[in-house]
Curated annotation (Swiss-Prot):
The protein's name in its UniProt record: Protein cornichon homolog 1
Record's subcellular location: Membrane
Primary site of residence: membrane
UniProt keyword Transmembrane, yes or no: yes
GO biological process: vesicle-mediated transport
Covalent S-S links between cysteines: none
Species for this entry: Arabidopsis thaliana
Keywords attached to this entry: Membrane, Transmembrane, Transmembrane helix
Membrane topology, from the record: Multi-pass membrane protein
Transmembrane region(s): 9-29, 61-81, 114-134
Family: Belongs to the cornichon family.
Listed InterPro entries: Cornichon
Length: 146
């Protein structure tokens, strides 16, 4: 059970990083729309977070697959496949010259991903709490055997 608790702690921090990353991207796009940032700064800030987000999402999905958590894997695999498709088609970076033309689509995409990552974060927090309670109650039961 200790490995299960470790899995959920790692998943907690990875999903928290994903939520923070996408939230930062939404803030950058909102600042661009309000004319607080120029297109170059916005695209630079967002583009440097895209590949780490893809890697974190893919590794989290792979972690769920390798630990046989099928429900979490099936929840996470559509976004992972979408990220792989974007990477394969080379459409994952925001172009400086066309950022204003596609800002509404990019914001909708980021809001959708933010909603998905918040949902995944809530699921992981629930399982982390459940695993911690089970882990600590089993340890207490083992102490009474001696």
């Amino acid at each position: 059970m200790a490995w299960d608790l470790f899995l959920w702690i790692v998943s907690f921090f990875v999903s928290l990083a994903l939520v923070a990353s996408v939230f930062y991207q939404v803030i950058c796009l909102t600042d661009l729309e309000a004319d607080y940032l120029n297109p170059f700064e916005t695209s630079t800030r967002i583009n440097r977070l895209v590949i780490p987000e893809f890697i974190l999402q893919g590794s989290l999905c792979l972690l769920f697959l390798l630990t046989w958590h099928w429900v979490f894997f099936l929840v996470a695999v559509p976004v992972t496949v979408y990220h792989a498709m974007l990477y394969k088609e080379r459409r994952y970076l925001i172009d400086v010259t066309e950022v204003f033309r596609g800002i509404s689509f990019e914001k909708k995409l980021r809001y959708t991903k933010l909603g998905f990552y918040v949902f995944l974060f809530i699921m992981v927090v629930f399982r982390l709490t459940l695993s911690a309670v089970y882990s600590f109650t089993e340890d207490d039961d083992l102490l009474h055997l001696f």
